[in-house]
């Protein structure tokens, strides 16, 4: 009997060949739920959409995998963590739409619908670490990417999760791309709602320090690209600068691009003035680290 990951790799190969001009969703993989995962977030209510393309009360982790255009395959892949303040997921412009763009440019992209922490910070971290293990375990070659080139992308609170995978997880990505990420819990600098949702009644000075990820950077943190706007009033730009400085202090390759306007949460939206610029920046940076 074939292993599940082998079957998934076969599906990806077939989908990537058949849909080279479509880059549509190729495969859906249910990772686990609160009854089968190592930890539960305690959410017993059904998953819901409080508004279109916003998913709340997530209690089952799922990967939605979009295969790279085989004619452009770079050998790289990404796990994408949408934002939403750790209470919901902005699954379109920070998830599916972004994944399709990566796939069209030769990078297999897997959108992670991760479980909301609901005061259990270990829950989304174990989801993203398992997602990375799954992607790294797919058969090299057949899927258009290799295990050593699986990176992570995250936006806002999803950026905090991506940075957590890069600093706290045992299975780390090969690289990380962070869009206007939540990084620090420091007073006056933090997006407090994200940390309240992440830590719940466990929140303390000690947990704030631990989950302020500029404090967790080491020489083992992967190369990182940060993209943000100077006028972000939701997640202050200092979150990114703190992380960037910590990366450089630890000898980690890093690049940061700060756009003058755009605010917060632009993702791959077409109305973001610097959309084409960030897209070219990402492709150039990925090409550079692949050498």
Q: What spans do the regions from the language model cover?
A:
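Primarily recognizes the serine-hydrolase "nucleophile elbow" in alpha/beta-hydrolase
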Residues: 130-194, 198, 208-209, 213
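Short beta-strand element of the alpha/beta-hydrolase
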Residues: 74-83
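Conserved alpha/beta-hydrolase "acid-adjacent" motif
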Residues: 233-242
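Active-site nucleophile elbow and catalytic-triad environment of alpha/beta-hydrolase enzymes
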Residues: 61, 201-216, 221-222
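N-terminal cap/lid segment of alpha/beta-hydrolase-fold proteins
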Residues: 21-72
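Short beta-strand/loop motif that positions the catalytic acidic residue
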Residues: 220, 226-228, 232
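C-terminal catalytic histidine-bearing segment of alpha/beta-hydrolase fold enzymes
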Residues: 241-291
């Amino acid at each position: 009997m074939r292993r599940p990951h082998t079957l998934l790799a076969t599906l990806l190969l077939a989908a990537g060949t058949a849909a080279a001009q479509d880059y549509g969703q190729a495969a859906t993989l249910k990772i686990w739920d609160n009854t089968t995962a190592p930890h539960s977030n305690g959410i017993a209510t059904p998953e819901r959409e409080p508004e279109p393309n916003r998913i709340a009360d997530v209690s089952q982790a799922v990967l939605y995998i979009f295969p790279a255009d085989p004619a452009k395959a770079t050998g790289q892949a990404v796990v994408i963590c949408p934002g939403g303040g750790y209470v919901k997921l902005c699954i379109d412009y920070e998830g599916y739409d972004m994944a399709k763009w990566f796939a069209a440019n030769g990078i297999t992209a897997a959108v992670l619908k991760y479980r909301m922490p609901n005061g259990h910070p270990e829950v989304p971290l174990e989801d993203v670490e398992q997602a990375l293990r799954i992607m790294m375990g797919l058969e090299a070659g057949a899927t258009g990417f290799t295990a050593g080139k699986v990176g992570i992308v995250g936006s806002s609170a999803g950026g905090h999760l991506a940075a957590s995978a890069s600093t706290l997880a045992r299975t780390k990505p090969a690289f990380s791309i962070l869009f206007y990420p939540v990084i620090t819990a420091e007073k006056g600098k933090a997006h407090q709602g994200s940390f309240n949702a992440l830590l719940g009644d466990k929140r303390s000075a000690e947990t704030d320090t631990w989950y302020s990820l500029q404090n967790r950077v080491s020489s083992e943190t992967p190369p990182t690209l940060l993209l943000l706007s100077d006028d972000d009033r939701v997640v202050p730009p200092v979150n990114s600068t703190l992380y960037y400085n910590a990366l450089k202090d630890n000898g980690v390759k890093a690049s940061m691009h700060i756009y003058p306007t755009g605010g917060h949460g632009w993702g791959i939206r077409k109305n973001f003035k610097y959309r084409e610029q960030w897209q070219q920046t990402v492709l150039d940076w990925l090409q550079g680290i692949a050498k």
